[in-house]
Amino acid sequence: FNGKLVIKPSKEGSSLGLYKLKNATLEEVKEAFAKSQEAGMTVLAEEYVFGRELTVAVLDMGEGLKAFPIIEIKAPDGDYDFEHKYYSDETVYVCPAEVSEDVTEKIKAVVEKAALSVGADAWSRIDVMLRDDGSFVLLEINTAPGMTPHSLVPLAARTCGISYEELVKQVAARASLKG
């Protein structure tokens, strides 16, 4: 145990109940577990991975599952919490992310396979941490990502020239094919 953990409820979203522990004592870990458990659900503990925070929308727009342009999330002090997701004007989203073509292609290939492997073959958004050496870690797959006009999936779609209305139609069409 090196004190670097992420503690979070298994079924929450938007970083609710999430604790990033950088140099935590065992007592601080126990406290984070207890707070995360207040929602009455299973708590997850993960390695705290440092790097650039990226996210990738993966959608089937009628031609098979494809990764959209990568988005880099630049939150103040690297803390992309609930406040910085929904209320801050300081968080910056760079789409497409400024990542080498080689790393971009590797990330896109891996997220497409990851989405298919969990049955998210219509749409999802996958969070990725990019390390300084070019290696990366998939953090989680969000199978029901935000879909407001200001959410990250529509941002990636707009970068490809796809309107919000067209995106919603395509996601709904894929859902009705499965339903």
Residue ranges, per PLM feature:
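Active-site "cap" helix and flanking loop/linker of ATP-utilizing ligase/carboxylase catalytic domains
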Residues: 72-124, 155-179
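Short secondary-structure junction motifs
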Residues: 16, 40-42, 121-125
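Glycine-rich phosphate-binding loop of ATP-grasp-fold ATP-dependent ligases
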Residues: 5-32, 53-55
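Conserved metal-phosphate-binding beta-hairpin within the catalytic cores
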Residues: 47, 115-147, 157
